Structure formats: C-alpha cells, structure tokens
Amino acid sequence: MGCNACQYGNPCIQKDGFSEFVPKVKAADLIVFASLLLFRTISAKLKAFIERFYCITEEDENPPLGRYEKYPVKDAALLMTSADDLFWTYEQAVSYYKFTIIHYIGFHDKGMWKDDLSGMR
C-alpha cells in the first residue's frame, strides 16, 4: 500500500491477517513459495503475499542504487505445479521468482521444484 505505517511501528491499516504472520516470516530460515501455475505465472494470492513483504523491510543506512529499504536475509525455494509439460510452461513464473524474490528482495535461492500433471491425462 505504501502508507509506511509499518515502517514507523504503527499497526497495518490493511486488515488481512498478514500482521500476525510477520514474526513467523522474520524468524524463518527458509521460505517456500508454492503455487499452482495460472495463466503461465504464480497465483494472484501468492503475488499479493509477496507484495506484503514490504512491511518486513528496514531502513538501509547505505542504500544501493537509491533503494532505502533492505530485507532480512532469508533462503527461498519455489514449488509449482501445472497441467502441461511444454518447455516454456514455467518460464514467466520462474522469471518473476528470480527477479522479485532473488534479485530485488535478495533472498538466497535454494532451488525450484516444478512438476506437471501430464501423466494424469
């Protein structure tokens, strides 16, 4: 939302239950991002979850490239499934994960598990 209430120790104005989840995210060593593949990318629910990670940032004293926030260092993994097995099936979802989670947020990639259900046809 960008209101910055969380950055000043105030309660979040977004009442979606994520505030209760924040201590668990901060305490976790590994965060597994799991989603069905929908329209060639992660689900809207997972994307909304990732976007809420803004509230776990802290001010960076020496910001690279003008970014003033820094995220805690965490390990991350991606778990996905889809109904087809084309070579490009996961391309957009993997790109989103690598750019957003690994490069922008700065989590350490611990791997991806992608499985198609083509054998069930």
Residue ranges and their predicted role:
Residues 11-97:
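Helix-loop-strand module that forms the ligand-binding subsite of alpha/beta enzymes
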Residues 1-11:
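Local cysteine-cluster metal-coordination motifs and their immediate loop/turn environment
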Residues 87-121:
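Glycine-rich phosphate/pyrophosphate-binding loop and the adjoining helix
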